[in-house]
Amino acid sequence: MNSKHITLRPITRKDYPFIEDIIRKTWKYDALSSNPKDAKHMARLYLRSCLLRATFSCVAAVDGKVLGVILAGSKKSVPKFALRRTLAQLWSIALLFTTKTGRDIGKFFSTFDQTDVELLKNAGNAFDAEICFFAVDESTRGTGIGKMLFAKALDYLEQEGTKTLYLFTDSSCTYQFYEKRGMQRLGEKTVEFSPHTDYRLNMFIYGLELQAAS
């Protein structure tokens, strides 16, 4: 893929369907429920929860299609559109909970959230910033899009004066990407859930000192 054809820009609402599709495929949400609508609602809810914490966004687009996205949150800035995004998140929760399978999935998400809180607490909880969400379409992995997006986020956080940052990832992702960039694994925990199929993830928290990385 020619890097000249890749556009890096802030996220817009028109990008949401593309990003939700990346989320659904990356975490295999379709395998979690017999109702295909649940996977879409889950992806929508996950994106809205990440947007609530983000103070920076960047998408990589080719011919108008988003193929990668990164969201970062700095404690030194306030997320934009907080009220609108909170309402959007509540609406996404309501849609997910309209079905029994969706309610089961909601419990699953709650387990993820609790695990994140536990991992962050055990890691010391003393960070200036977070990579809220980072993913690329599987068709573009290995093309350098991920490197470009990650570099953009680090540039922003360095401008914010960030000294330490963290992110959550899991065994369904290419977590080795972070280790190659100097991030240290600070904790891990296994989560299992089986509404209709076996689903198991090893969840990780990684940390980075930006001064040491620069």
Segments from the language model and where they lie:
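Conserved acetyl-CoA-binding loop-helix of GNAT-fold acetyltransferases
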Residues: 136, 142-155, 180
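Conserved GNAT acetyl-CoA-binding A-motif
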Residues: 128-129, 157-170
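Active-site rim helix/loop that mediates acceptor-substrate recognition in acyltransferases
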Residues: 36-57, 62, 67, 71, ...
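Conserved GNAT-fold acetyl-CoA-binding loop/helix
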Residues: 27-46, 86-88, 99
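Conserved active-site alpha-helix within GNAT-family acetyltransferase domains
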Residues: 147, 171-188
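A short beta-loop-alpha structural element at the N-terminal edge
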Residues: 6-21, 74
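Conserved catalytic-core motifs of GNAT/GCN5-like acyltransferases
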Residues: 166, 184-202
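Conserved acyl-donor/pantetheine-binding loop and adjacent beta-alpha core of acyl/acetyltransferases
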Residues: 76-128, 193-197
